[in-house]
Curated annotation (Swiss-Prot):
InterPro entries (alphabetical): Methylosome_Comp_WDR77, WD40/YVTN_repeat-like_dom_sf, WD40_repeat_CS, WD40_repeat_dom_sf, WD40_rpt
UniProt keyword terms in alphabetical order: Cytoplasm, Nucleus, Phosphoprotein, Repeat, WD repeat
Phosphothreonine modified-residue sites: 5
Main location: nucleus
Record-given protein name: Methylosome protein WDR77
N-terminal signal peptide: none
Pfam families, sorted: WD40 (PF00400)
Keyword Cytoplasm: yes
Compartments (UniProt record): Nucleus; Cytoplasm
Organism: Bos taurus (Bovine)
GO molecular function: methyl-CpG binding
Length: 342
């Protein structure tokens, strides 16, 4: 395993305190989501999960090392409720899953100092827990604690289809990066469904989640169009080929629930897994651990790989930390018997 090395930081003197006029004065404590943009800018979603109101906010940092310091953000905006999930729509659109039950689309202005609301639609009857943009970039999928999945036309600002195929709360949806009509969903009914919206019966059940533990997170392999990975409430991560009946590989990675999974942009991609055990694990193609960080002091909620530096992985959590991890640029060979212990 690799030891953690802190990334080079931009000297504080080189940064300029310049809070945009419409940005909130203070970021909520719980960081729920993080996404790098193609140019290396970092988007954060924050929530306040205490008190009488569940507030939330969105923040853009052109310098990711300055996050989560509000004074160094490029743009920020208060949301009506907590942010459960978010994702980029192109380079300027931001799709948000809200604790209010709304799916929200926000957009950066031309100067990227304002985040402007494009729509806020209350089509779900409970917290929207997850959103994902289909590979076309014009449609998206949302999943909610109301057991429903909805397919959206973002340009028309409307729901195209609504499905109630799960008999429990939907915990994750993941659009295929390879096919614009295909996505995955999982829920608290202990099922993983493979969807193809072109079919008369669009959902088919994957027979890989019969462990008795609820699936909590999903992601597609970036290069193999029939392969995906899921994590469960027990901390197990499993690799699945949709063309075969069961799991190809499984590994108990965490001691608590898996909260997020994301593949790296490497030619042989790493898999980052984050968890309620407050740790980050990075796995190779065989789900063997190559890196572990326990730097967070509360639930780790999301991870995102830098598009500019493939060795840089950023995590956020409920401890209000944005932590940058440096990894090897490519997977390492298996260690020999004389390798020094960490």
């Amino acid at each position: 395993m690799r030891k953690e090395t802190p990334p080079p930081l931009v000297p504080p003197a080189a940064r300029e305190w310049n809070l945009p006029p419409n940005a909130p004065a203070c970021m909520e404590r719980q960081l729920e989501a993080a996404r790098y943009r193609s140019d290396g800018a970092l988007l954060l979603g924050a929530s306040s999960l205490s008190g009488r109101c569940w507030a939330g906010s969105l923040w853009l940092f052109k310098d990711p090392c300055a996050a989560p310091n509000e004074g160094f953000c490029s743009a920020g905006v208060q949301t009506e409720a907590g942010v459960a999930d978010l994702t980029w729509v192109g380079d300027r659109g931001i799709l948000v899953a809200s604790d209010s039950g709304a799916v929200e689309l926000w957009e950066l202005d031309e100067n990227e100092t304002l985040i402007v609301s494009k729509f806020c639609k209350y089509e779900h009857d409970d917290i929207v827990s997850t959103v994902s943009v289909l590979s076309s970039g014009t449609h998206a999928v949302s999943g909610s604690k109301d057991f429903c999945i909805k397919v959206w036309d973002l340009a028309q600002q409307m729901v195209l289809n609504s499905y109630r195929a799960h008999s429990g709360q939907v915990t994750c949806v993941a659009a295929s990066p390879h096919k614009d009509s295909v996505f995955l969903s999982c829920g608290e009914d202990n099922r993983i469904l493979l969807w193809d919206t072109r079919c008369p019966k669009p959902a088919s059940q994957m027979g890989c989640s019969a462990s008795g533990y609820l699936p909590t997170s999903l992601t597609w392999h970036p290069q193999q169009s029939e392969v995906f990975v899921f994590g469960d409430e027990n901390g197990t991560v499993s690799l699945v080929d949709t063309k075969s009946a069961g799991c190809a590989v499984s590994s108990v990675v965490h001691s608590q629930c898996v909260t997020g999974l994301v593949f790296s942009p490497h030619s042989a991609p790493f898999l980052a897994s984050v968890s309620e055990d407050c740790s980050l694990a990075v796995l190779d193609s065989g789900l063997s651990e190559v890196f572990r960080s326990r730097a967070h002091r509360d639930f780790v909620r999301d991870a995102t790989w830098s598009p500019l530096n493939h060795s840089l992985l950023t995590t956020v959590g409920w401890d209000h930390q944005v932590i940058h991890h440096i990894l090897p640029t490519e997977p390492l060979p298996e260690p020999g018997p004389k390798s020094a212990a960490e």
